[in-house]
Amino acid sequence: EGYEFFPAIGMEEPFRYRNKAQYPVGTAKDGSIVMGFYAGRTHSIISCTDCKIGAVENQFILAVIKSWMELNGVAPYDEQTGRGLVRHVLIRTGFHTDEIMVCLVINGIKMSGKLKESLVKRLTEVSLDSDISTDKCIKSIMLNFNTENTNVILGRQCETLWGKSYIEDYIGDIKYQISPLSFFQVNPRQTEKLYGKALEYAGLTGSETVWDLYCGIGTISLF
């Protein structure tokens, strides 16, 4: 009572909007490499490389990484034994810039030069693959090191294998540099709608002092 509720501001096209995807990597019952998402309330991986809210390019990138692992005998991480190398694949996409970052999360503190070179070669080739019909291309290939027995996906340290250590994207007219460890809103279209509505409701005149607490990288106050 005493409140007015407005309808939710939805998306016109609620598909292919998500600019970040994290895929666990494991071993299927038949011994093959599996990439996808965890089944509900489990750590059993359901094979799925094309989620309809994610970028279409992700599936081709995952296919290349899986093939690279198979050809080079690179084992997926096993949570039970703590063995195996590849834990997750993180893919970030610049919604406004079409830049792609691929980050391999590994159970180790280093990877051999031969493996690095072959991975970079395969991934830089896929950025020009005819299967990718957009203007998007890989601008950053990274390693992230996570040797902890934890559910946390990323470790604290990263290494740049090729390209930049970040990709760039915009919210409004502000350009941001986004690393594997950056917190950045995952739905660019709705982010701008949300921030715009918040600014409208705030009704700021320029004479106020506003504290932007717990602001992350400051996207709201900079908008």
Language-model segments: what does each one mean?
Residues E1-F223:
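Accessory RNA-recognition modules of RNA-modification enzymes
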